[in-house]
């Protein structure tokens, strides 16, 4: 193990030639040097993941949560709902593409109808007219598309700044954040960064109450986030009807 860690440091020294994603995956692999025989089979990188979780949690409490709290307090509910609707409408475009890639006809049709109705009759998506017309959302991303076609989730990974993920979703993330996000194509940098920040803050504001409740009841926040995330993503890939998982082998003593 020491040999592999030393080799990893030599490779990391050439990080200027690595893409950000490759560097991140390298860090996760190197973290495997710290795993032991009793590691959770779904979370073999737990030491690395816990450190990233603590980093993200500290950053959230220091910056994001206070900003989201202030945003929620000073922004009228109607305006915040409009902000959420606007970004949901953008996400529905990518959901349409992934529903098509997964050969989900109903999901693709509904997503296309939602985008059309909300864009033209909902003031560019600020009003959710489609939901009033009972046109359901079918959110899909590229990670779900890979899962649909048999790509396994792989080990659980906590990404700095992005939070809980899996190896499959980490590979899909650059596609979701570039090809699948129209905001990234805005050439005006101040406008693009403003929209990114607004979406981040608005998303955090929507889960403030749930986060506070979790702080009170969760004995181990890391384990709770991991298990709930893995279950949620599994349900999303299989549209709420995941197959039964095979019993996990007992760790060697």
Region locations from a protein language model:
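Beta-rich strand-turn-strand
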Residues: 84-86
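C-terminal motif of bacterial Sec signal peptides marking the signal peptidase cleavage site
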Residues: 29-32
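Post-signal peptide N-terminal segment of mature Sec-exported envelope proteins
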Residues: 40-70, 88
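Mid-length scaffold segments of soluble, non-membrane domains
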Residues: 89-167
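Bacterial N-terminal signal peptides that target proteins for export
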Residues: 2-22
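Bacterial signal peptide processing site
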Residues: 34-38
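A structured, mid-to-C-terminal "fold-capping" secondary-structure block
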Residues: 144, 149-253
């Amino acid at each position: 193990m020491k040999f592999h860690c030393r080799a990893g440091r030599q490779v990391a020294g050439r990080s200027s030639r690595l893409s950000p994603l490759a560097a991140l995956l390298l860090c996760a692999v190197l973290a495997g040097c710290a795993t032991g025989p009793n590691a959770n089979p779904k979370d073999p990188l737990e030491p690395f993941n816990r450190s990233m979780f603590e980093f993200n949690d500290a950053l959230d409490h220091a910056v994001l949560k206070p900003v989201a709290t202030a945003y929620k307090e000073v922004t009228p509910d109607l305006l915040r709902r409009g902000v959420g609707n606007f970004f949901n409408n953008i996400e529905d475009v990518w959901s349409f593409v992934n529903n098509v890639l997964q050969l989900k006809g109903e999901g693709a049709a509904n997503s296309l109808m939602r985008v059309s109705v909300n864009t033209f009759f909902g003031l560019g998506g600020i009003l959710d007219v489609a939901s009033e017309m009972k046109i359901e959302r079918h959110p899909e991303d590229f990670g779900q598309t890979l899962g649909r076609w048999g790509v396994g989730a792989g080990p659980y990974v906590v990404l700095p700044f992005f939070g809980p993920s899996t190896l499959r979703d980490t590979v899909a993330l650059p596609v979701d954040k570039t090809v699948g996000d129209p905001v990234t194509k805005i050439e005006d940098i101040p406008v693009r960064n403003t929209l990114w920040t607004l979406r981040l803050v608005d998303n955090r504001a929507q889960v403030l109450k749930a986060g506070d409740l979790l702080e009170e009841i969760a004995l181990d926040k890391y384990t709770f986030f991991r298990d709930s995330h893995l279950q949620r993503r599994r349900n999303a890939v299989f549209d709420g009807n995941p197959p039964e998982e095979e019993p996990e082998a007992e760790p060697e003593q």
